[in-house]
Amino acid sequence: MISSVYFKRSALVCALAAAFPLAAQTEDTLIVTAKPDDSASAQTQGYSAKTSTGATKTDQPLITTAQSVSVITRLQIADQGANTVSQALQYTPGVYSSFGGGATRFDTISLRGYHGGDVDNLFLDGMRLMSDGGSHNVLQIDPWFIERVDVIRGPSSALYGQSVPGGVVNLTSKRPQFSQQGHFRLTGGTQNTKGAAFDYTDAINDQWAWRLIGMTRSSDTQYDHTREERYAISPSLLWQPDSDTSLLLRADLQKDPSGGYHGSLPLDGTRYAHNGRKLSPSTNEGDPGDGYQRREQIYSYEFNHQFNDVWSAYSAGSYTHTNVSLDQVYQVGWVGDSDMLSRGYSGSRGSLDAWSTDNRLRADFTTGELAHTLILGAEYHRFRNDLWTGAGNAAPLNPFTGYTPQTGHTITYSDNNNRRYYQTGFYLQDEMVWNRWHLDVSGRYDRIVSQQVSDTSGTSNRRSDDHISGRASLLYALDNGLSPYLSYSQAITPAMLPGADGTLLKPTTAEQVEAGLKFQPPGSSDLYSIAIYDLMQKDVATRDPNIATATYIPAGKVHSQGVELEAHNQITPQLSTIASYTWNRLRFQDTKDGTDSNTPQLSPDQMASFWARYQLPAGITVGAGVRYIGKQWADDANTERLPSVTLLDAMARADLGAWSTAMKGAYIQVNANNIGDREYLSGCYGTGNCYWGAERSVTATVGYDF
């Protein structure tokens, strides 16, 4: 039964409700200038997208997709000034991507309350982003290289294999175009932020096109003694000899000499005063010599061929190589009642090599009055991550007086090991259409192998699992633009955690039932949706309370129920809006650590957002947004709760070509996030490890588009 908290009045919810038009509303204001390419691989237009490949791996209209799918377009990313994927998702329902606060080293994304790491829910161009969440070898893609972000909410293992129960996030790279386009920009702002970026594409001839994208950015960040620095470039080449065949080659190269801050502070001293004083949001409990360096290389191809009116083929593959170096001093709590923080040291060196491929055949045919889109696919993923890890002690620190020269750290433990992962999957899907009925049935078999080998101790732990995942959905598309639907789906997520005997635990599984209603006024790109879901994850790993060492037992469930609303609309040719609301109820069940009926940490009970963009005369565009993050528990024991927070963002852009034809294509844009500079805790991993939210930031961009 949905709690009465769902009906709590708020201005954001009212704004969302007001955004829903009546089904019978006329379309006199619709202005059509040209028919754009609506395919999911094409360049996005405005704030709305009509299609997505995320839920079905086929180019499917969102209005007839029986699953919750949100699309963040290129314009939305640019208008909101997102510098990370996590920031790009802040106005998306069912997603909490801000719990890392001002720490932006990794894209921390929670979907429908499940934050299963930075590996199992991130995909690039439809293939898994080959990170290792069990180490610090986690990749990050800069939004400057992204055309769109598709968020597919709900279990998705029937097509993608290993994934978290809450869904997957698919990043679509910018592609070469057969027309000349260029984008150049310089950026500066608070925290000594500086950056430059370019993006140029053109045709070589009628069969070949190329694109070259690059960027650099640096910042002193909001934390003392830390710095972020990035250099990245991506060349790509497209061969399209005819309308039936295409081959895309791409490389993504990135170097992060400084990965910024990724520490945490106790709740006592942040949420509450410690000995009468509170720690500043700029507090860094580490040492100035701490460092995180990351190098990424991704080489990929994508091939499409249409054999005839029925059969077509798709093949994609990638090779990934990453190197990571980490030296970090971190706090482990107050020393008694003193002002000193006890600290430890963690070090890591990692080199990861990964291969990934996805191949499928597609058949479009009819049997009587029933139209079919059938796909048969095979995937293979593997990585090997060679690691050195070290741990030890570091000198205590008084965070109120700041860093003073310490005696350094001592390494008391080190290990040379490697982590290996293999996944082989075969999947089948049939999308059937009869009149207005849309039935989608899919299934997948996966063999997942996880292995950890310690070269130091000579031990090896290996686990192999076979699993079948399924999905079925039914949707009815009415002529007036309404589409009610019902779906059932499953997920599998390997745990890779050690049990008492040293063996790895079996994967967790999940299943969901979702019902929803979508509305798209005929002839428009506006889209309004509501979804209600019931999602259960089983065999969740729980720390064994009877053993002092870090061992786990497969016990417990996490039950997620919720309601999500979303609206993307073009109210007038000048005014575009995005609105969302999320109510999410999470509970532990059947646990062995005393947390039954508790709510997991990092799970706000409500979230809401509203963003509006308005084009004024004389080339001026303004945008403003509000984000509400509801209350959340700081720990799984539910002993402390973080308060809700409301944050304001804004944007203003001046197209200088409206003032002088000599400056056509030039623009100036200013973005401000957390305008009120609210101090808040964005999330806690228990009461001992909390993150300050991102402080106010202001950036100015001077750019040129053609």
What are the roles of these predicted feature ranges?
Residues E27-S179, A491, A515:
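Acidic, small-polar-rich N-terminal luminal/periplasmic segments of exported/outer-membrane proteins
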Residues M130-S131, H136, F145-E147, A158-I233, ...:
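Outer-membrane beta-barrel translocator/receptor signature
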Residues R217-T221, S234-Q306, H321-L352, A395-R419, ...:
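Acidic/polar loop-and-plug regions of large Gram-negative outer-membrane beta-barrel proteins
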Residues P257-T270, R382-L387, V449, L475-F519, ...:
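Surface-exposed extracellular loop regions of Gram-negative outer-membrane beta-barrel proteins
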Residues E302-S318, T322-Q328, P484, P507-Q589, ...:
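Membrane-embedded beta-barrel scaffold of Gram-negative outer-membrane proteins
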Residues R436, D534, P554-D636, G676-E679, ...:
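Gram-negative outer-membrane beta-barrel transporters
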